Design a protein with these regions (language model features):
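Core residues of bacterial helix-turn-helix
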Residues: 22, 33-36, 63, 105, ...
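Short alpha-helical "recognition helix" segments of helix-turn-helix
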Residues: 28-33, 108-113
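DNA major-groove recognition helix of helix-turn-helix/homeodomain DNA-binding modules
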Residues: 54-69, 135-151
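Residue-level signal for the short linker/turn that defines the boundary of a DNA-recognition helix
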Residues: 24, 51-54, 107, 132-135
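A short, Lys/Arg-rich alpha-helix, primarily the initiator
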Residues: 1-24, 68-70, 75-106, 149-151
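Recognition helix of helix-turn-helix/homeodomain-like DNA-binding domains
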Residues: 34-51, 117-132
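The DNA-contacting recognition helix of HTH DNA-binding domains
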Residues: 26, 37-40, 67, 109, ...
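Acidic (E/D-rich), amphipathic helical modules within compact regulatory domains
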Residues: 43-44, 49, 55, 59, ...
Length: 159
């Protein structure tokens, strides 16, 4: 598995021109976000290149965009011998597609967790609750033979 850097200042750089294109400052974007995304935290997130997936979705929403992501298949991996029991109840749908990507390659949560030095239940917790850092999403995708790809899509104009 390739090493994924938690601090990758380039990871979130693509959103900076989008924020400015909407005439927003980092402080103004923070004011438009829900209270969990504090104003001073946005420059920090961009500087370190990491944030929670849910925070990324909230920042996109506040700037008038939609946060979208997918995993691109980049290499085969050994399927697991275990029964793949999917996560079936979700507190957040944000990471729900991860289960579909894992099922395509017949990868169980315990085996994915083992590749990352975590338990299957820790991976299941991330997916079920939608609590995952962007860097953790990259690591999970890489361990499963995928590449994590994300973007902010423009929302259609409301007439």
């Amino acid at each position: 598995m390739s090493e994924v850097k938690t601090k990758n200042p380039q990871r979130l750089r693509p959103i900076v021109p989008l924020i400015h294109r909407e005439g927003l400052s980092m402080a103004k974007l923070g004011e438009l976000c829900n209270p969990k995304v504090e104003r001073g935290g946005i420059p920090y997130r961009i500087r370190t290149g990491d944030c929670m997936m849910a925070d990324m979705a909230e920042m996109a929403r506040a700037a008038g965009y939609k946060f979208v992501w997918h995993w691109e298949d980049v290499r085969p991996v050994e399927p697991t011998a275990r029964l793949v029991r999917p996560v079936t109840s979700f507190k957040s749908d944000l990471l729900k597609p991860v289960m579909d990507y894992l099922a395509l390659k017949n990868i169980s949560l315990p085996d994915l967790g083992k590749k990352l030095g975590l338990s299957g239940s820790a991976i299941g917790y991330r997916i079920r609750n939608g609590v995952c850092m962007m860097s953790q999403m990259e690591e999970m995708a890489d361990a499963a033979g995928y590449k994590f790809v994300w973007d902010w899509e423009e929302l259609p104009e409301v007439v």
